[in-house]
Structure formats: C-alpha cells, structure tokens
C-alpha cells in the first residue's frame, strides 16, 4: 500500500517512463542504423500514428509524399513501414524488383488458427510454391468456368438486366445503390460457381454479401500488422506528373487526338507485377456491362438536398466510396 502513495507512486511512474524511453531508444537505434528513407519523426511508442489521419489516409499520404518525396518511411508503433508513391517508384518496386517485393507479411490470425500455407488462399499468401500453385489453380478454374469467354459475358449481361430492374423498382427515389451493386457482383460469382443466380431478396444471397463485406474488412485490419512496404496505388492513379487533370474524371486521359482509346501505363487499379489482380478480366467485363446497361436505361442525378458524392475513398481493401445517395430516372426511349 505504502508503495502506491506519494513518492512511491512518483518513483514508479518515473521508472516506467524511463524504461519505455529506453526501449524506444533501442528501436530508434535500429531505425537509424537501417537507413530508412526520410519521414516524419516518430513519437515514442506511438510512432507516427498521431501524424496520419486514419479517416482520410489517401490525403494524409499525399501530404507526406509532397513533404518527404515519393518513397518515405512511417512507423506504426515500433514497426517501420515504407510507403511507395507515384508511377515511377511503384513500377520500380512492383515490376523491376517484382521478385523481391512479391511476398506478404505473415497474418497473425492464420498462426493462431493453425492455418497451413496451402490453406492461405492467394491474396494473403506468402510468395512461395503454395501461392504459385493456388494462383495457377484459381486462374485456370476461373477460365474453365468462363472468365474471358462469351459464356460468362451472357451471365454478366443477364445480371446487368436484373440490376437495372432493381434500379427501376426504386426509380425517382433517393437511394444508396451499394447493396444492389454488391448483390449483382455476388451473383456473377454465384453464376460461375453454382451456375445459378439468386433473387436480390433471397436470404442466402444477403448472407453471402454480408460475409464477403465482413471478410474484406477483416483483411484490411490485418494487412498493416506485418506490412513493411505499402504501395499507394491512389498516388499513381492521381499522379500529377503523369495525368493532365489528376483529380478529375476526365475521359480525355484515355483518348488520343482522333478520339481513339489509348491505354495508359499509370492506370493500374489492379496493381502490377506478380501479385496483380487475377480477376481483372472478370472485373472489367462486369464494370463495362453493368455501367453501359445502367447508363442506357437511366439518367442519374444527385437527389435534391443531398451533397455530391465525395471523391475521397474509404481506406480499406479495396478502397471504397464513402456512402452517397443518387436518384435514377428511367430514360425515355431514344434519349
Ligand atoms: C474492380 C474490381 C477489382 C479491383 C479494383 C481489384 C484490385 C486488386 C488489387 C489492387 C490487387 C493487388 C492486391 C495486393 O497487392 O495485395 C488484387 C489482387 C487480387 N484480386 Fe482483385 N480486384 C478486383 C476484382 C477482383 C475479382 C472479381 C476477383 C476474383 C474473381 C479478384 C481476385 C483477386 C485475387 C485472388 C488477388 C490476389 C492476387 C495475388 O496475390 O496473387 N479481384 N485485386
């Protein structure tokens, strides 16, 4: 009891602070000797946690990149991380040094659950024979089931029709289309795997969408745990040294002087190199068919009294739009 009174308490507090500062100093020495790229000075114990706005990570990283350069360091607690920004540096890391940067940090929950390397799936798996085998298997299975083929296009077109019907049912109202879009995407995967789709009210489909959403959030929570290298794809998609109007939707970015489509090397929403998205052909097909179908059938507007959708993303995997409302009105034929 005596120990917790007055001077005893003070001595204990001072001892604890000195102990923490010493441990912190040991970690800092490791950082100094390892010669990390520049970055903001980390706080003892917390690292740079208070210097980044977790609710708007892309903007925080954007400001840091302008201050410290395209490759800079941050510390999450005592864990050092290197953030890579803009086309040139990202290409160098993902493509030129692809072999050295294709690994993924161990996932603590996998260890706790005793998940074996062969059961880690593709996205989070370490770069090794198990990942290679799972990736090859996934690509060939997706192809067998129709990825990149006409048969899948029919499923996606059919689903786009159902999506349009769901929009029609709520035409003229202020809606958040997220749930409908997620159900349509889940149905495409269901078409691939089960060769059938589900009605949007079907409890099974609703459960599936919820599970996918939850698992994605979990993943984003675990990624930073062991991550030392963070590839900031947003900084490539909005690279001011590459795009004419980097912060605007500007279709001319992808058109030549004659109005023909041109590919742009900085357009890499599916990443690049060995760990690039393997579902890209399917995702592109879905985006094209869903968008064209919706835009042909409806005029979209911001409902009266609602703000314009924000261009800031919600920082998860993948980055998602912040909630927004829109109003879809059925187009008159020929307009
Ligand atoms: C618009 C939709 C999509 C976007 C923007 C997207 C984006 C990405 C990105 C940026 C990565 C790299 C992640 C990393 O570096 O760790 C990735 C990986 C991956 N994506 Fe996608 N993706 C999309 C749709 C899909 C679909 C439809 C599938 C499945 C059919 C899929 C399956 C995968 C897999 C399995 C990986 C891990 C690849 C590996 O680590 O080897 N994605 N995706």
Regions found by a protein language model. Give the residues of each.
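Hydrophobic, repeat-rich solenoid/adaptor surfaces of innate immune receptors and signaling proteins
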Residues: 83-87, 163, 189-193, 227, ...
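Cytochrome P450 heme-thiolate "Cys pocket" and heme-binding signature region
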Residues: 257-287, 312-313
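Cytochrome P450 substrate-recognition site 1
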Residues: 32-52, 57-152, 176, 181-188, ...
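Conserved cytochrome P450 K-helix/beta-meander segment immediately N-terminal to the heme-binding cysteine loop
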Residues: 231-259
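Cytochrome P450
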Residues: 2-18, 75-82, 146-158, 168-191, ...
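N-terminal membrane/targeting module of cytochrome P450s
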Residues: 1-26, 88-108, 133, 335
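Cytochrome P450 C-terminal beta-domain/meander region
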Residues: 66-71, 223-230, 245, 250, ...
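Cytochrome P450 heme-binding "Cys pocket" and the immediately downstream C-terminal segment
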Residues: 102, 280-321
């Amino acid at each position: 009891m005596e120990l917790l009174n007055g001077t005893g308490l003070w001595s204990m507090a001072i001892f604890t602070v000195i102990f923490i500062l010493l441990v912190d100093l040991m970690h800092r020495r490791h950082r100094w000797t390892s010669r990390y790229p520049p970055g903001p000075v980390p706080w003892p114990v917390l690292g740079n946690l208070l210097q980044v706005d977790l609710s708007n990570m892309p903007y925080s990283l954007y400001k840091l990149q302008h201050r410290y350069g395209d490759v800079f360091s941050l510390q999450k607690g005592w864990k050092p991380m290197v953030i890579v920004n803009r086309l040139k540096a990202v290409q160098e890391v993902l493509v030129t040094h692809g072999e050295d940067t294709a690994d993924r940090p161990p996932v603590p929950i996998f260890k706790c659950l005793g998940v074996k390397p062969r059961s880690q799936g593709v996205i989070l798996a370490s770069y090794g024979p198990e990942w290679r085998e799972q990736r090859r298997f996934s690509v060939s299975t997706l192809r067998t089931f129709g990825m990149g083929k006409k048969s899948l296009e029919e499923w996606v077109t059919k689903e786009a029709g159902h999506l349009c019907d769901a929009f029609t049912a709520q035409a003229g109202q202020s809606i958040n289309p997220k749930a409908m879009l997620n159900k349509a995407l889940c149905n495409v995967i269901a078409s691939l795997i089960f060769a059938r789709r589900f009605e949007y009210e079907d409890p099974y489909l609703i459960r599936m969408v919820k599970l996918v959403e939850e698992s994605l959030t979990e993943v984003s929570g675990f990624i930073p745990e062991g991550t030392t290298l963070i590839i900031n794809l947003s900084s490539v998609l909005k690279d001011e040294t590459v795009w004419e109007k980097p912060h605007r939707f500007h279709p001319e970015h992808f058109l030549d002087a004659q109005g023909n489509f041109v590919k742009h090397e900085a357009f890499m929403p599916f990443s690049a190199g060995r760990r690039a998205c393997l579902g890209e052909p399917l995702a592109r097909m879905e985006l094209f068919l869903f968008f064209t179908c919706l835009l042909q059938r409806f005029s979209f507007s911001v409902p009266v009294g609602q703000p314009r959708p924000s261009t800031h993303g919600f920082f998860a995997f993948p980055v998602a739009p912040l909630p927004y409302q829109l109003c879809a009105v059925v187009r008159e034929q020929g307009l």
